[in-house]
């Protein structure tokens, strides 16, 4: 590990250190109080636009579960397990590519252009799916949708009023997944109803295209292209109660970060190198991308994509309606996550949920042992009784703890990265998501056939358990810390103990400040 702690050159060290101090130690950041002021209706329009983008993301990742159940032989034949995996995983593969392209192009061409492109891809993909009469056509349609999903994941939402928009992003994704299951259940008895399920995905994309003309480009993007006056106008429209000083402070805060990136002149390969040769950066990347991989490889996406297939295999008459319970659980417990995460802390939530996810998957594996399923995943006897109910209950418990913990927290880890490598670090985080997603979606049914359902779910239980071990040793709590503090944490190894002491100091400082305020009153 010693080699990881050496910078590429002393001169680079000096320049980089000066710029870090300028950004991370800037008093402007401490005076950036504008976000404590009231947001305008205009800001909520921006938030709504972001929510529609998240809804698109959620709907198109959720609807495949129903489509797989009701495709029948409409594509010229009944799909086998490998063909179902292809149709499903190709979307994640497209999202992997879309996330890379969107991440690299966002600064140069702006967020709005990226969102427009994503919407067009959603619409084209939906049309291709609706018109599909072969597996090849359906695969192309799902791949095009995947490109749109990856774009949406990278560029929606913009970082304007952070908490409201980020919260709406998480909730809109799970809302899209819940609605997709509802639409699937509604068209379950309609002839070729899966085509209607697919075309509904184009509706929010059209709505988003109609909303975008009323939304400005992000202030950061405007500053990036030397349009400071326009950026100030946008900030004033978002925060109407802010005074001129607060607007200028916000503008200067954004300008510092933009100019830092320009002065560093950091190429893609330079950032990738810094993430791998600088020890603190590498550990931050390992912790962030590792949690993301665990969140995807632990089995949630096998449930999201294949719940209809699973519940049909264990004997439920209306598998998509039953799957709606899973989507509703995900939606409800995402709310709980948003309530708890800043109060309890991410590390504590992860430590309390990952082992319970493993326990729930283990229970599902045990229940599957008592359900007679053929190697082709067809139920042999309808007398499944308690075991089928046990599978459903175990999955509900798993999804509940997943949504409270790793499912949402994994996306929050981008703040581990220092400013000079955050752009590429965040892109790698998204790539970890979609790369792991491809692995799960392209192997789940094969696992079920080759090592039995019990073996597949036991495997996912083991991944969640090893994830718990990884969090215990490698995932520090950075709640309330500055960028400089977070950098210091990862300079102390993975800094779990160091971060714990920092949290004690922050808590003591907060109590002292509160007591001083009370005495003044």
Each model region followed by its residue ranges:
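Short intracellular "coupling" helices and adjacent cytoplasmic loop segments at the cytosolic face
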Residues: 237-250
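Cytosol/matrix-facing amphipathic helices and coiled-coil assembly/linker segments
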Residues: 247-260
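Alpha-helical transmembrane bundle of multi-pass membrane proteins
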Residues: 1-239, 259-521
């Amino acid at each position: 590990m010693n080699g990881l702690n050496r910078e590429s050159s002393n001169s680079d060290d000096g320049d980089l250190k000066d710029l870090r101090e300028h950004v991370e130690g800037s008093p402007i950041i401490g005076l950036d109080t504008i976000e404590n002021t009231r947001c305008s209706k205009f800001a909520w329009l921006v938030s709504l636009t972001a929510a529609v983008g998240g809804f698109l993301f959620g709907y198109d990742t959720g609807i495949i579960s129903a489509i797989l159940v009701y495709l029948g032989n409409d594509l010229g034949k009944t799909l086998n397990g490998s063909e179902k995996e292809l149709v499903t995983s190709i979307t994640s593969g497209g999202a992997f590519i879309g996330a890379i392209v969107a991440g690299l192009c966002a600064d140069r061409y702006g967020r709005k252009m990226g969102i427009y492109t994503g919407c067009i891809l959603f619409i084209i993909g939906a049309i291709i799916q609706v018109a599909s009469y072969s597996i090849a056509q359906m695969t192309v349609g799902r791949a095009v949708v995947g490109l749109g999903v990856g774009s949406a994941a990278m560029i929606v939402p913009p970082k304007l009023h952070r908490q409201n928009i980020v919260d709406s992003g998480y909730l809109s994704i799970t809302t899209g997944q819940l609605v997709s299951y509802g639409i699937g259940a509604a068209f379950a008895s309609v002839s070729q109803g899966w085509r209607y399920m697919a075309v509904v995905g184009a509706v929010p994309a059209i709505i988003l295209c109609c909303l975008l003309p009323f939304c400005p480009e992000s202030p950061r993007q405007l500053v990036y292209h030397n349009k400071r006056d326009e950026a100030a106008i946008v900030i004033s429209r978002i925060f109407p109660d802010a005074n001129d000083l607060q607007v200028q402070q916000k503008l200067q805060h954004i300008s510092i970060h933009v100019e830092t990136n320009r002065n560093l002149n950091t190429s893609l390969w330079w950032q990738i190198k810094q993430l791998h040769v600088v020890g603190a950066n590498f550990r931050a990347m390992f912790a962030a991308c590792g949690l993301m991989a665990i969140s995807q490889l632990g089995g949630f996406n096998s449930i999201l994509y294949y719940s209809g297939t699973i519940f049909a295999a264990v004997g439920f008459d209306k598998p998509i309606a039953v799957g709606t319970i899973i989507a509703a659980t995900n939606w409800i417990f995402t709310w709980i996550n948003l309530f708890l995460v800043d109060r309890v802390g991410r590390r504590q939530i992860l430590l309390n949920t990952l082992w319970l996810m493993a326990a729930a998957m283990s229970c599902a594996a045990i229940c599957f042992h008592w359900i007679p399923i053929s190697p082709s995943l067809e139920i042999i006897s309808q007398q499944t009784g308690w075991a089928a109910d046990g599978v459903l209950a175990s999955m509900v418990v798993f999804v509940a703890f997943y949504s409270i913990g790793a499912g949402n927290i994994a996306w929050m880890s981008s703040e581990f990265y220092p400013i000079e490598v955050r752009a590429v670090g965040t892109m790698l985080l998204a790539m970890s998501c979609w790369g792991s997603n491809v692995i799960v979606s392209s192997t789940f049914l094969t696992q079920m056939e080759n090592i039995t359902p019990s073996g597949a779910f036991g495997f996912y239980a083991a991944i969640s358990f090893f994830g718990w071990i990884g969090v215990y040793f490698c995932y520090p709590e950075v709640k309330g810390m500055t960028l400089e503090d977070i950098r210091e944490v990862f300079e102390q190894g993975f800094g779990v103990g160091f971060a714990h002491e920092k949290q004690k100091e922050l808590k003591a400082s907060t109590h002292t400040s509160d007591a001083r305020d009370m005495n003044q009153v």
